[in-house]
Curated annotation (Swiss-Prot):
Gene responsible for this protein: grpE
Assembly with partners or alone: Homodimer.
Family of the protein in this entry: Belongs to the GrpE family.
Protein name: Protein GrpE
Compartments reported by the entry: Cytoplasm
MF GO annotations: adenyl-nucleotide exchange factor activity; protein homodimerization activity; protein-folding chaperone binding; unfolded protein binding
Keyword terms of this UniProt record: Chaperone, Cytoplasm, Stress response
Function text: Participates actively in the response to hyperosmotic and heat shock by preventing the aggregation of stress-denatured proteins, in association with DnaK and GrpE. It is the nucleotide exchange factor for DnaK and may function as a thermosensor. Unfolded proteins bind initially to DnaJ; upon interaction with the DnaJ-bound protein, DnaK hydrolyzes its bound ATP, resulting in the formation of a stable complex. GrpE releases ADP from DnaK; ATP binding to DnaK triggers the release of the substrate protein, thus completing the reaction cycle.
Region listing for Disordered, in residue ranges: 1-78
Keyword Cell wall biogenesis/degradation found: no
One GO-annotated biological process of the protein: protein folding
A Pfam family of this chain: GrpE
Keyword Acyltransferase applies: no
InterPro entries: GrpE, GrpE_coiled_coil, GrpE_head
Length: 218
């Protein structure tokens, strides 16, 4: 067994200055590693933030468009346009109602007018029949003829038409046959004699003509 040498032991111990330098070197390496890791994290962070920011920006644009549309309806111009459209629609409805009312009123007025004429004509029918008989069976003096002509023109002015002529085809819608007379020469039913003239306004028959009908022999 070798003898313990104190001087050799002391020489083998590490120098305090060398140990301190080694410690400083180790600390610097660790700090460099941490700094590199931090820089890598910082480099990745903007990339992630950019990826997350894109959908958020798109969503913000959509939200902005919705807010813009909503805000447009609330602007004075948007309100004015809406009010103008409402007023136009109401005006068109009122105009249509007025036109319908005017048409109904005109029809009512024409109906009342015709009723008034019919009432007057009905009241004068006996006198008109007497005038026609005088014309047919006797000579009328000039003064009486002038009065009869004025009466006829007055009724024509109000749309009253006299009808019923000898020889015309018999029509049960406007002729009232008081007698059917067989006629060997007749090929169809015709008016042989007008007893009382008929009167109508337009297509409306006020009184059918009273006639004698010539009928074909069987």
């Amino acid at each position: 067994m070798s003898e313990f040498n104190k001087d050799d032991y002391l020489n083998d111990l590490p120098d305090p200055s060398d140990a301190e330098a080694a410690a400083q070197a180790s600390s610097g390496a660790d700090a460099s590693a941490e700094s590199g890791s931090a820089q890598d994290s910082a480099a990745q962070a903007p990339s992630n933030e950019g990826a997350d920011a894109a959908p958020a920006a798109a969503e913000g644009e959509k939200t902005g468009e919705g807010q813009s549309d909503s805000a447009d309806t609330l602007t004075p111009l948007g309100k004015a346009k809406k009010e103008a459209a409402d007023y136009l629609e109401a005006l068109q409805r009122e105009r249509a109602e007025f036109i319908n009312y005017r048409n109904r009123t005109q029809k009512e007025q024409e109906r009342f007018r015709q009723h008034g004429i019919i009432d007057v004509l009905t009241a004068l029918l006996p006198a008109l029949d007497d005038i026609d008989r005088i014309r047919e069976h006797s000579e009328m003096d000039d003064s009486f003829k002038a009065v009869a002509t004025k009466i006829d023109k007055a009724f024509e002015k109000f749309g009253v038409e006299k009808f019923g002529e000898k020889g015309e085809d018999f029509d049960p819608t406007k002729h009232d046959a008081i007698l059917h007379k067989p006629d060997a020469d007749a090929e169809k039913e015709t008016v042989d004699t007008v007893v009382e003239a008929g009167y109508r306004i337009g297509d409306r028959v006020i009184r059918a003509a009273r006639v004698v009908v010539a009928s074909p022999q069987n």
